[in-house]
Amino acid sequence: MTHNHDPYSDAAALKGLTLGQATAYQAEYDASLLQGVPRKLNRDAIQLSGELPFHGTDIWTGYELSWLNAKGKPVVAILEVQLDINSVNLIESKSFKLYLNSFNQTKFDSVEAVQETLSRDLAACAEGEVTVKVIEPKHFNLERIIDLPGTCIDDLDIEVTEYEFNPDHLIGGTDPDKNVAETLNSNLLKSNCLITSQPDWGSVMVRYQGPKIDREKLLRYLISFRQHNEFHEQCVERIFVDLKKYCQCTKLTVYARYTRRGGLDINPYRSDFENPPESNRLARQ
């Protein structure tokens, strides 16, 4: 089994997070509640430095966005945020939830004012580009539930005895005599929160070109995240790097959609050849 030094055990950037701590909920606007985690922590561990081998975005959906209008009447909306992966920080999810809760008893003159506030604060926390969309109730009927594209590999009849993260499952995991372009997906992705070890449930799509990947080996590899502690964004980047390394994909996209917690879901997208699709939720989200 391949072992790596834990990059998080002594990370100063994780010491002050509200995640895993008892916290009071604030109902009035407070941008200081947002907390960022340096992307560099994980990228150093997977030997990513300089120019990244992928582009992409972290797509967040917030289902519990509410504020007061100028007359004090409550307003609700769905929030969609796209955070560029070149930002210095990812946004820690509990702090994001606490920050959104701080809108609940705060008056805003318009939806545009809410959107501008969110854009400014999230960009400042992430130190990067952020796109914010506030979806009003009159547009809720446009929200769709879809399946991830591709062939699902979850019905493979395999025996599993190992649940610790192990990229060695991918060794010898391709047929070099068969070059293909295909899209595979699995609903069996589970990892755990880096700080609290609470389960994170997700579905993942792998679209690639290159030597044909052994689906059984890929499924075993994905299942090996089951006891792995890492943030969503970090897991997806780790999958991308491992597939490029072990499977020699010439083109690759990894896209995961995680179930929501605290009214927020996180959907990291990484690719070296295509752009993110329109964000539509899956049934479990």
Curated annotation (Swiss-Prot):
SUPFAM superfamilies: Tetrahydrobiopterin biosynthesis enzymes-like. Keywords: Cytoplasm, NADP, Oxidoreductase, Queuosine biosynthesis. Substrate binds at I91, E92, S93, H232, E233. GO terms for molecular function: preQ1 synthase activity. InterPro entries: GTP-CH-I_C/QueF, NADPH_dep_7-cyano-7-deazaG_red, QueF, QueF_N, QueF_type2. NADPH binds at S93, K94, R261, G262. The active site is at C193, D200. One of its GO terms (biological process) is tRNA modification. One of its GO terms (cellular component) is cytoplasm. It comes from the Bacteria. It catalyses: 7-aminomethyl-7-carbaguanine + 2 NADP(+) = 7-cyano-7-deazaguanine + 2 NADPH + 3 H(+). Pathway: tRNA modification; tRNA-queuosine biosynthesis. Its EC number is 1.7.1.13. Signal peptide: none annotated. It is found in: Cytoplasm. HAMAP family: QueF_type2. Homodimer. Belongs to the GTP cyclohydrolase I family. QueF type 2 subfamily. Catalyzes the NADPH-dependent reduction of 7-cyano-7-deazaguanine (preQ0) to 7-aminomethyl-7-deazaguanine (preQ1). This is NADPH-dependent 7-cyano-7-deazaguanine reductase. It comes from Shewanella frigidimarina (strain NCIMB 400). The gene is queF.
